[in-house]
Amino acid sequence: MKWIVVVSVLALVSPAMAQVTLKPALAPLNFLVGNWKGDDGKVADTGGTSKGGSVISAQSDGNALLRVDHTELFDKAGKPAGGFHQTMLIYPDNGAIRAEYVDGEGHAIHYVASEIVAGKSVTFSSPPKEFPLFRLRYELQAPGTLAVSFSMVPPGQTEFRPIADGTLHKSR
């Protein structure tokens, strides 16, 4: 009887776990899909480090990518300094790829532009006339290794400065 229950549950769960194919507009970003674990990242403002992971999955029948993260922060001495959750939705809109980011600290960033090298990298940018300006870049360094960098131009300045960067490794 137990095996009938197990088989029934697996039959119900299997379609939900099946790989969703990205629609053509998002297909160049397929390299982002997966479960990623981070090495020690660098946090420029504090001189500390960060550690965490991301799950990036195809959603809405392949019409969107959803990134869900958790990040732990550490001070210069390596002691815990807090942490937060992050969510980002990546989607096509009128011929462009856009993204919406929110985190557990109350930040929201609207990425209105992207530069994509299919299967290799994507750089998201916030609106050019709104300050601060933000830029988020993912670059595939090798199969299963993804470099991430996040930078901003503060109000009254003209140059991007790093906020955080690190490397993610695909775990599944």
Per-segment meaning from a language model:
Residues 1-4:
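Positively charged n-region of N-terminal signal peptides that target proteins for export
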Residues 13-15:
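N-terminal signal peptide c-region/cleavage motif recognized by signal peptidases
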Residues 18-172:
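Hydrophobic small-molecule pocket/channel-lining residues, especially in calycin-type beta-barrels
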